[in-house]
């Protein structure tokens, strides 16, 4: 690690959203205020909260991003994790702030945090690459990945997973959450998208946002029903940043590493968390799935609040943090208290309606500020270790340098201190700097004097030449340059001598250190050859001197003769000779000095190279010593660390020693290079010597050409050559010393080789140790695996035992329920027998009806009270059973403590009295604390209830004021301001305003009281319960536990008694309400009969009905239009009972269908009406409106199974219906939908007929009396129990089996299924029924033969093809009405079938295979095509005898196929593409791509010859169009996307002319124009369930649609208006197909119905009432 992790607190920002228009209309006040310029928010009047950031109502998205998030994105590039999560109640603006909602039409100013962060991220990436390239560094490499998770109902879902089923959200996901060794959280099984650009990232965000679960509640139109976590992983590889120059000067390793770039890898992850809002079911009005989602959301947020409390409370930091209580807290574990820079955005509402939610949010946010995160850089291990080692080396080198320089010393006692020499050294350095400045000034002076001397000497020489008459400008310039060069060379000579002196000192010091490296010196042949050459040069120089001496003697003789002849000429000639010789001497001297300087410089370079080499070797030795010491320290740490740490250390040491070996090899190579350079320099010096000889010969020749020489000139030449010889001798000595140094270096090479071998041996030993440790680790892992498997077996055994116990418990519970049912039945029979004791005539019964209705109440009260007594008794028994373990727990310690009683008795009583007193005091403290907490919570709860009541009152008053305002405006428009009604309305509005103001003041006072209670609760926690419990002794703890147990039992008993009392009172209240409702119904029916003759009574009755209709319904759902009451005069009688039941609160929220008119039995007896209502709501699988129970039973008894028509079969109840009405289940299956009921007029007609038939049956009854009108229906006769098992009966109630099989009570289901599978299918005529003539279609035949649901259908005029879940495709002859053949051998369901008229081939689809059948001779599979484009001759699936669910790797599920009109091309929808097949060659030619989700349906049309038009619909909600020409190859992109898309996946497509019709899972149908490619019309809620199939009625401009609820609807294509609807099947309709005359519909009820169109007049039907009657009857 680079260092210790930094402490970073969780930063908190509060954002207050603006008030909604609805809140303003309802008069909600703002209860929050923000201090200007300060991050402080006030709630209520004076309760202040301080946070890191506070954003008021008018804050913008950009402001929030810049202040909060921008720094976190920059931190990601430095390797720091970051988390942003939005917290708050539902509808507080979390999704808007985070930007996960993803609205297409959003403006740039309203972009959320995620969109801005993505833009900032990729912009910074480009900038960093540009800066690196500009600085000449390699561009950093960035890898950006994205994940999008959804936590829905405590299940982690992958929003990027396009293969998962969107409807299977409740299933358990395969995503697992794990924790790594550093405490980081990562997920397994999540799709990770690699992203390169900003647009790709936004596309990923859009894809995930569309897949996220949202729904509408009363508080929010589009409420998030899950927690969303959008994670961006950034991995960058960049050049390590440069280290300071001060450290790099003394550190050679760092200087070398600076020359070659070192890279480091940094990783960071950024969580964007959009939490679902906390919500209250009362306010959201959620039921069913929404309620379950809300509970799951609140559970996750509760766990998050507990984690925040545990981390934020300083007193609880040492305790356990419950991260594992929820998957939400588990995913955010490293964001809360871990390695992350976290910011929490608390979104709150300013309205006083949300006061409590805002208070709780601010309290949690305030607590979250105390959370401390440990932030560290996420660096790869190699870079971390290298940086750690580099910093350690730097520190050690600095310390070593301080010891070397004397700054640090250790005295005799081992104490480290600073040396006084350090201060002296600092003073000397200061003096040195001053002297350096003086030297620089003196150097400038010397340069100036040198230039002046050069000028003076050149002027003197020019003057001499001018006197001689031979001077010109060229000669003077040449003399000036020579003199200047001579002065420069003289200065260089002095510098070289000084450098030479310094190098000699260094050489002396190096030779003094030479004994450290022992060994014999060897001379290379190059050095020996250079010695010989030097000796030869010296001999030649001696010979030249002898020659010069002889010539000098001759010159002297000749000079004497010349002096005598003419002294003047001789003097002039002597002067000229002197000037020439001076110039020659100067030139020779300059050349010799230049050569000497070059030799000295080269020699100094050589010596400096040797010195550098020595320094490198010394540093390498230091490194080796440091490595050995680090090896020793590592070996000591290996004994203490575990196997993993040992392995990492050994790997690191191997790498370090391998690096040292490489360094030694490099130094060896440098030594060879140095030797080579040394020999090259010797050769260069020999060449210079030769040049000097040539120059000497030239000088001698020049001297020989001169006729007269003086003796002085000879002496000068001799002395000059002697100097040269001396210089050469010195150079020879210097070269010999360098030769010795080279020999010493060669001797040291053997030592380096020994060290290299030693290090290699160490590396091999470490590798062996590593292998041994790996083996040990594997053994330990194997042991752990065996232990884990043994534990898993034990756990499995325990689970098995637990399941057995649970099974036994369920059996006992079922037995108990059966006993209760029998007891209830007997009680009912006894009651019925008592009522039958005194029979009455019809006349008397009619007179006494009212009295009976009123007098039955006490009897029913007694019955209900008796039932309550029974339930109390059963509950008391259960409580006694539950108390048995407690008694056992209390009795268990008794034997153990009996032996110790004598000891306690021997002791005095003083100790026990003292202990009991202290324990009693502690118990009183704890009890008082518990009571205070309960009272505080009750007080706050009461205050909150009062505030909610005030809010409701204010809402009602506001609505009344709004109505009065509208009424006033209307009156003013009609009559003007002078109307007296306006004044009355004004007065009423003023009083309402005063009431609203008073309520607002009361709300403010209530809020202030709540705040005071919260403060008192926080300040009043003076008693530390934890400290009291920790201070308890064992005896005191037992005493406290005993009292707590007793108090818990007492409280539980009191709660149970209160609950029993409440249930008894509720039962009485309900009974009273039912009695009242019955009386009201009788009263209104009697009044209604008389109202026909009395107009005044009719008017009064009409007003009463209007008042009933105006009663508000709080429990009724308002999601669909079915719930709106019909107040037409014709429906008064039918809606009367439902209105009365609304008054009594008896309307059940899930029953959307209005209740039918009550019968006389239900009017007289509340029990029968309740049972009938239960029957109507309990069994939703009945095909129509249920008849009364007695009628249903009579039909069931009097109707024979063999002679029953299909129509009567639909009316009779299924065998799954229990024989006793009281045991009817009140819960219908989730998959079934409510069946629409007929209009009130039709219902009234139907039940008048039912009442007449019932009266006739009563006349012909055996008793001969009208006891049926007085007594409730008796128990039905016992029927033979159905042989179906529980699961089959459940399946029957869900409507997934055939109706005909359900009706055969005596038949065995398994046998019938075997017979059905063995015999061939047949097409039977469908019996005609009354009332069906009104529907545009008439069912004429029904095809039966499949054993499971029929999924697909295709037909010609003569043949019918059906595919089913029973893995077969059947071929039917429409002429004979029989099954021709069955095409089997499919691995799974047959999901699509197509027939080609031109080739007589049948194509069937199952999983990822397309089978091609030739049915001309027999059912033979000739080829098998796969989704990946492979072709197999014959049947590739024949080996699979059982059902195969798994799809081979590389293949995809094929959902549907389609043929082009000419039958030459086949198109198969597999995955998110459509594969094209050329049927002439049976080869795959390409794919149609473009969809993001699986393609569910497609249709093909022909534009022109050789050009096909393909329309595809996908689960991604989009419809795409492709134009494919003949011969098209490869990937084909869509030519058009139809906009706007559906709200859910597409299930059906059909083309009619230039129009396209699409049906979707969003229950809607859309009509598109293919020429203009526009949306023409749409019906949003065309059906109440998924639109699964579409078709066109032959020879009529009519569209037919079928839904998952089994409903068929007919639409006019031109106006797109509904023509009619009918219950086509009792189960989901899967496919619709047409030929030239008929329509075929396939459904889950294993049948295919054949329909024929009636004569339609413009597609309209006049009598909708008959249509409704038809629907009801069918």
Swiss-Prot record:
Residues 1146-1167 are annotated as: Interaction with KANK1 and KANK2. WD repeats lie at residues 1345-1382, 1385-1423, 1449-1487, 1490-1532, 1541-1578, 1582-1621, 1624-1661. The modification Phosphoserine is found at residues 524, 1212, 1225, 1229, 1239, 1662, 1673. Changing residue 28 to W: In CFEOM1; prevents the interaction between the motor domain and the coiled-coil domain, expected to cause loss of autoinhibition and gain of function. One of its GO terms (cellular component) is kinesin complex. Residues 598-637 have a biased composition (Acidic residues). It comes from the Eukaryota. This is Kinesin-like protein KIF21A. The gene is KIF21A.
């Amino acid at each position: 690690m680079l260092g210790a992790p930094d402490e970073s607190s969780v930063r908190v920002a509060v954002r207050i959203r603006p008030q909604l228009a609805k809140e303003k209309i309802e008069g909600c006040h703002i209860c929050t205020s923000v201090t200007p310029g300060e991050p402080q928010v006030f709630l209520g009047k004076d309760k202040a909260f301080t946070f890191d950031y506070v954003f008021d109502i008018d804050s913008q998205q950009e402001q929030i991003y810049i202040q909060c998030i921008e720094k976190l994105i920059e931190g990601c590039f430095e390797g720091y994790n970051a988390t942003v999560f939005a917290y708050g109640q539902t509808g507080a603006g979390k999704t808007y702030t985070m930007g996960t909602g993803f609205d297409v039409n959003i403006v740039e100013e309203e972009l959320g945090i995620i969109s801005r962060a993505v833009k900032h991220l990729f912009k910074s990436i480009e900038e960093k690459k540009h800066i690196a390239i500009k600085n000449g560094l390699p561009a950093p490499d960035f890898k950006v990945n994205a994940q999008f998770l959804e936590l829905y109902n405590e299940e982690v879902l992958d929003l990027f997973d396009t293969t998962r089923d969107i409807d299977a959200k409740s299933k358990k996901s395969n995503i697992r959450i794990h924790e790594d060794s550093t405490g980081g959280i990562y997920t397994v099984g999540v799709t990770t998208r690699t992203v390169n650009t900003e647009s790709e990232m936004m596309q990923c965000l859009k894809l995930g946002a569309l897949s996220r679960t949202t729904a509408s509640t009363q508080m929010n139109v589009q409420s998030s029903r899950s927690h969303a976590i959008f994670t961006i992983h950034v991995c960058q590889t960049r050049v390590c940043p440069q280290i300071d120059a001060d450290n790099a000067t003394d550190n050679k390793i760092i200087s070398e590493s600076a020359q070659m770039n070192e890279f480091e890898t940094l990783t960071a992850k950024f969580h964007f968390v959009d939490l679902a809002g906390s919500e209250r079911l009362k306010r959201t009005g959620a039921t069913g799935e929404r309620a379950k989602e809300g509970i799951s959301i609140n559970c996750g947020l509760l766990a998050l609040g507990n984690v925040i409390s545990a981390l934020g409370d300083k007193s609880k930091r040492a305790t356990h943090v419950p991260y594992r209580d929820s998957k939400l807290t588990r995913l955010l574990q490293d964001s809360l208290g871990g390695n992350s820079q976290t910011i929490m955005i608390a979104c709150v509402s300013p309205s006083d309606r949300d006061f409590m939610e805002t208070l709780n949010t601010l309290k949690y946010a305030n607590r979250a500020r105390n959370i401390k995160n440990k932030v560290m850089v996420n660096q790869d291990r190699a870079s971390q270790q290298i940086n750690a080692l580099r910093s350690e080396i730097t520190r050690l080198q600095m310390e070593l340098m301080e010891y070397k320089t004397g700054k640090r010393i250790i005295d005799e006692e081992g104490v480290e201190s600073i040396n006084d020499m350090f201060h002296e050294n600092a003073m000397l350095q200061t003096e040195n700097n001053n002297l350096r400045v003086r030297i620089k000034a003196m150097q400038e002076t010397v340069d100036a004097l040198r230039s002046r001397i050069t000028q003076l000497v050149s002027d003197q020489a020019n003057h001499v030449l001018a006197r001689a008459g031979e001077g010109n400008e060229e000669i003077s310039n040449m003399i000036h340059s020579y003199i200047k060069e001579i002065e420069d060379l003289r200065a260089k000579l002095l510098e070289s001598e000084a450098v030479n002196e310094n190098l000699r000192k260094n050489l002396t010091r190096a030779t003094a250190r030479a004994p450290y490296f022992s060994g014999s010196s060897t001379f290379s042949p190059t050095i020996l050859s250079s010695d010989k050459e030097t000796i030869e040069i010296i001999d030649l120089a001696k010979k030249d001197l002898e020659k010069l001496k002889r010539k000098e003697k001759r010159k002297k003789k000749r000079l004497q003769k010349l002096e005598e002849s003419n002294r003047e000429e001789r003097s002039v000639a002597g002067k000229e000779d002197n000037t020439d010789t001076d110039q020659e001497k100067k030139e020779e001297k300059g050349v010799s000095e230049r050569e000497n300087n070059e030799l000295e410089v080269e020699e100094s370079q050589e010596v400096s190279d040797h010195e550098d080499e020595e320094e490198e070797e010394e540093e390498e030795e230091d490194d080796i010593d440091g490595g050995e010491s680090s090896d020793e320290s590592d070996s000591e740490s290996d004994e203490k660390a575990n196997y993993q740490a040992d392995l990492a250390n050994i790997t690191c040491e191997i790498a370090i020693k391998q690096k040292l070996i490489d360094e030694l090899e490099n130094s060896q190579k440098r030594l060879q290079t140095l030797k080579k350079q040394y020999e090259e320099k010797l050769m260069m010096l020999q060449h210079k010597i030769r040049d000097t000889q040539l120059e000497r010969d030239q000088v001698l020749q020049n001297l020989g050409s001169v006729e007269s020489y003086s003796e002085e000139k000879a002496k000068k030449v001799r002395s000059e050559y002697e100097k040269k010889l001396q210089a050469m001798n010195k150079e020879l000595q210097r070269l010999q010393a360098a030769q010795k140094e080279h020999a010493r270096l060669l001797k040291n090479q053997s030592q380096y080789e020994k060290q290299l071998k030693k290090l290699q041996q160490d590396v091999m030993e470490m590798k062996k140790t590593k292998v041994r440790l790996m083996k040990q680790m594997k053994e330990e892992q194997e042991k752990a695996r065996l232990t884990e498997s043994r534990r898993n077996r034990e756990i499995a055994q325990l689970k098995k035992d637990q399941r057995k116990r649970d099974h036994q418990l369920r059996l006992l519970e079922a037995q108990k329920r059966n006993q209760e049912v029998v007891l209830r039945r007997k009680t009912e029979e006894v009651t019925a027998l008592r009522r039958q004791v005194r029979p009455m005539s019809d006349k008397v019964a009619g007179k006494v009806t009212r009295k009976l209705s009123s007098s039955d109440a006490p009897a029913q009260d007694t019955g209900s009270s008796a039932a309550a007594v029974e339930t109390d008794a059963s509950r008391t028994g259960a409580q006694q059973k539950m108390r048995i373990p407690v008694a056992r727990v209390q009795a268990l310690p008794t034997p153990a403590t009996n032996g110790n009683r004598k000891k306690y008795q021997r002791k005095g009583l003083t100790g026990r009295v003292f202990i009991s007193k202290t324990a009693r005091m502690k118990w009183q403290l704890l009890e008082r604390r518990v009571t205070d907490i309960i009272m505080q919570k009750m007080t706050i709860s009461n205050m909150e209830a009062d505030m909610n009541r005030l809010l409701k009152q204010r809402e009602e008053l506001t609505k009344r004021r709004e109505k009065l305002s509208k009424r006033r405006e209307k009156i003013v428009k009609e009559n003007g301001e002078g109307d007296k009604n306006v004044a009355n309305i004004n007065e009423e509005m003023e009083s309402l305003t005063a009431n609203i103001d008073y309520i607002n003041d009361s709300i403010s006072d209530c809020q202030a009281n709540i705040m005071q209670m919260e403060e008192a609760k926080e300040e009043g926690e003076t008693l530390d319960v934890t400290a009291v419990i920790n201070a308890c002794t064992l005896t005191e703890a037992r005493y406290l536990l005993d009292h707590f147990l007793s108090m818990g039992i007492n409280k539980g008993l009191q709660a149970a008694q209160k609950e029993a009392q409440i249930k008894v009172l509720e039962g009485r209240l309900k009974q009273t309400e039912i009695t009242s409702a019955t009386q009201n119904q009788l009263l209104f029916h009697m009044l209604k009969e008389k109202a026909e003759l009395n107009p005044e009574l009719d008017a009064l009755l009409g007003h009463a009905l209007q008042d009933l209709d105006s009663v508000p319904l709080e429990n009724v759902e308002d999601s669909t239009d079915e719930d709106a009451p019909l107040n037409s005069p014709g429906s008064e009688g039918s809606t009367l009972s439902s209105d009365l039941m609304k008054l009594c609160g008896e309307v059940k929220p899930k029953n959307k269908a209005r209740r039918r008119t009550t019968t006389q039995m239900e009017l007289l007896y509340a029990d029968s009406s309740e049972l009938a209502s239960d029957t109507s709501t309990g069994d939703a699988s009945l095909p129509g409106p249920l008849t009364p129970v007695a009628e249903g039973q009579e039909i069931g008894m009097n109707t024979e199974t063999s002679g029953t028509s299909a129509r009567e079969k639909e009316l009779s109840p299924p065998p799954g219906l229990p024989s006793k009405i009281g045991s009817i289940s009140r819960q219908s299956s989730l998959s079934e939908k409510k069946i629409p009921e007929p209009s009130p007029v039709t219902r009234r007609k139907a039940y008048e007929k039912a009442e007449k038939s019932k009266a006739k049956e009563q006349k012909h009854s055996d008793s001969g009396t009208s006891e049926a009108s007085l007594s409730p229906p008796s128990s039905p006769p016992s029927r033979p129990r159905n042989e179906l098992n529980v699961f089959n009966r459940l399946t029957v109630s869900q409507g997934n089996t055939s109706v005909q099989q359900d009706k055969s009570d005596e038949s065995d289901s398994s046998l019938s299924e075997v017979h059905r599978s063995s015999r061939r299918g047949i097409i039977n005529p469908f019996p005609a029924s009354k009332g069906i003539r009104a529907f545009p279609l008439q069912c004429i035949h029904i095809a039966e033969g499949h054993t499971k649901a029929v999924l697909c259908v295709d037909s010609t005029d003569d043949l019918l093809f059906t595919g089913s879940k029973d893995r077969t495709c059947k071929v039917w002859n429409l002429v004979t009405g029989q099954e021709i053949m069955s095409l089997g051998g499919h691995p799974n369901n047959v999901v699509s079938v197509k027939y080609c008229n031109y080739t007589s081939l049948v194509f069937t689809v199952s999983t990822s295979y397309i089978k091609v059948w030739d049915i001309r001779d027999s059912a033979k599979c000739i080829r098998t095509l796969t989704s990946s484009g492979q072709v197999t001759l014959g049947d590739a699936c024949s080996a699979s005898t059982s059902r195969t669910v798994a799809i081979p790797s590389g293949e995809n599920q094929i959902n549907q196929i389609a043929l082009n009109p000419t039958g030459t091309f086949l198109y198969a929808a597999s995955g998110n593409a459509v594969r094209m097949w050329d049927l002439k060659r049976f080869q795959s030619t390409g794919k149609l791509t473009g969809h993001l989700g699986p393609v569910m349906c497609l249709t093909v049309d022909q534009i022109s010859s050789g050009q096909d038009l393909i329309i595809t619909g996908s689960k991604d909600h989009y419809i795409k169009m492709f134009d494919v020409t003949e011969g098209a190859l490869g990937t084909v992109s869509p030519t058009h996307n139809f906009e706007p898309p559906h709200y859910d996946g597409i299930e059906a497509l059909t083309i009619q002319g230039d129009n396209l019709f699409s049906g979707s899972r969003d229950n809607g149908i859309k009509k598109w124009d293919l020429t203009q490619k526009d949306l023409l019309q749409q019906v949003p809620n065309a059906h109440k369930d998924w639109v699964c199939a579409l078709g066109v009625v032959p020879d009529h401009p009519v569209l037919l649609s079928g839904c998952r609820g089994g409903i068929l609807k007919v639409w006019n294509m031109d106006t797109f208006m509904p023509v009619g609807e009918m219950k086509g099947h009792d189960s989901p309709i899967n496919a619709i197909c047409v030929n030239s005359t008929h329509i075929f519909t396939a459904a889950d009820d294993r049948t295919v119905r054949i329909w024929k169109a009636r004569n339609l007049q413009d597609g309209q039907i006049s009598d909708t009432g008959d249509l409704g009657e038809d629907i009801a009857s069918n």
